[in-house]
Amino acid sequence: AEIDRPVSLSGLTEGEAREFHGVFMTSFMVFIAVAIVAHILAWMWRPWIPGPEGYA
């Protein structure tokens, strides 16, 4: 059995954890970029903070 291998809380090896972290961070950054673009487009369409004249 693999008794000599250090076991982490997640059960992943160091390499597996690093690989998962890389994929996770890349996916997260893509998600954040899409969210930022969506917010910019929504703001251009209908701003949600009124100007001095209110929602005119």
Swiss-Prot record:
GO molecular function annotations of the record: bacteriochlorophyll binding; electron transporter, transferring electrons within the cyclic electron transport pathway of photosynthesis activity; metal ion binding
GO cellular component terms given for this protein: plasma membrane; plasma membrane light-harvesting complex
Cytoplasmic side: 1-22
Subunit architecture: The core complex is formed by different alpha and beta chains, binding bacteriochlorophyll molecules, and arranged most probably in tetrameric structures disposed around the reaction center. The non-pigmented gamma chains may constitute additional components.
Protein name: Light-harvesting protein B-880 beta chain
Keywords annotated in UniProt: Antenna complex, Bacteriochlorophyll, Cell inner membrane, Cell membrane, Chlorophyll, Chromophore, Light-harvesting polypeptide, Magnesium, Membrane, Metal-binding, Transmembrane, Transmembrane helix
The species this protein was found in: Afifella marina
Main location: membrane
Protein origin, superkingdom: Bacteria
Stored PROSITE patterns: ANTENNA_COMP_BETA
